[in-house]
Amino acid sequence: MKKSRFIVGFIVAVVLGGGALLWGPTLLAEGDNVNMQLAKLNFILRTVRDNYVDVPDPSKLLEGAIRGMLEELDPHSVYIPPEDQKRINETFRGEFEGVGITFSIQNKWLTVVSPIPGTPADRLGIRAGDRIIKINNVSAYGITNDQVFEKLRGPKGTSVDVTIARPGINDPIDFTIVRDTIPIYSVAASFLMHDGQTGYVRINQFTATTDHEVEQALDSLRTQGMRRLLLDLRSNPGGYLDQAWKVADLFMPRKDMMLVYTKGRTARSNQEFYSTGRGAKYDFPVIVLINHGSASASEIVSGAIQDHDRGLVIGEVSFGKGLVQTPYPLPDGSAVRITTARYYTPSGRLIQRPYDKGIAEYIAEGYDDTGEEAPPDTTPREVYHTDHGRMVYGGGGISPDSTVKSPRGTATTARLLSQRLYFECAADYAAKHPELATNFERFLSGFQVPDEMLTELRALAKERKVQIVEDEWTKDLDFTKSNLKGELANVLFNDRNLYHAVRIESDAQVLTAITLFGQANQMAQ
């Protein structure tokens, strides 16, 4: 294999000619069988076009054929339509041009979940809970997510008029928002916990700026007195491979430590990535949190830390995605994302789960708890060893050093979450109690969700015809209170750090991790 310490071009390459080759003479020359199959596809397309009972859309037929072809490969080789690819590019580039809000559609109304700090919407005073009732003097009732993107995003320097209904204020408020470049942060939260020594960093996904964001967060936390780190990769679906190894690099104590390697059919698919030594300054104990939703790049980071005994991994078995995709853009703005390699952790583990039973079962198994109660050595998985000789396992995600399951909410909680009723209740309560926003420390330590707020949540659920089953409500009452307080903190203070600071107060996985820093400290020596 070729040793590389730099971003590998094939992972993020823009290969405009790659798509065209699928229809070029190189493919046709590979054998008569391919020619026959292409002729068959062409015949079927013409036959459907000329004889189907309704007039079909040929482009949709071809897109369906492309999807069907890729489904024969693996669950992660996919076709991406132009509009979806445009948004994916914006997300992973780390910025887009627009007004700067996160939003949801609630009861058919466009509702601001939070203005992104420092953006045009934030500077104008738009708040969480504001309901956008008009865009450019046209009603926004019944608007779809795609229409929101179309109307609110646009070139920097252009403007859009919005009319807002604000809880607690009778008359609508008009704003003219001048669009700007909006950053998309992959570090969702970074703060010093209440004990004054534990840093908490949560990464949502691995985009083009993640390693710089994490490094800035670590430097800032060290100046605040951080002596140990809780790295939260739960529900992080992954992202760029180069960002995964660069983040892992931040936690390695010296140069030339293997971080991850890839194997594929071509020479450029076979790569090794090693530490650069820049992580030597971050010599504090580390605990990584993972769950069933931690995949791909998240597993590269947690696998490297675990294999080198750099820290502990706590939580649930990760998803188990050990495949690397290369995007091949097409001329119309769409793309095909093809699996070109498998990746392996430093000890040699391939953590990809089998996917021969179909995509639906593959996804379901990734979130299944089956087998987690059994001791690891009773499972039929390949055994590998860390630098210090600890046993770790391949073929089914990253197994945590200590399993702590996250509570599985009831169906009642799932319904309340899906309708964003916790947020809506918090926004209404914040409008009635603005005095709560004067001091976060007082809010964090002193505020308890009152019965009044719980009553309002139940009334809201009844109004929206969301069923509450009484024994499920009782079972999840602590979660309900924690979520309401977290959403209230976000609305009052417009700071996602504060939302997470509230939520982790009662987080079983976080609380268990805190008790295990003694072990993590021994590893860091």
Model-derived regions: residue spans:
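Positively charged n-region of N-terminal signal peptides that target proteins for export
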Residues: M1-R5
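Hydrophobic membrane-insertion alpha-helices, especially the h-region
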Residues: V8-W23
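Cleft-lining beta-strand/loop regions that shape enzyme active-site pockets
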Residues: P25-Q37, L41, L45-V53, D57-P58, ...
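Extended, small/polar residue-biased N-terminal targeting/export presequences
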Residues: Y52-V113, S159-A189, D256, R503-I514, ...
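Residue-level recognition of conserved beta-strand edge/terminus positions
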Residues: I135-N136, A165, T339, P354, ...
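Polar, glycine-rich mid-to-C-terminal structural blocks
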Residues: A297, D309, E316, G320-E382
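Conserved functional hotspot residues or short segments at active or partner-binding sites
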Residues: L350-I351, Y355-Q525
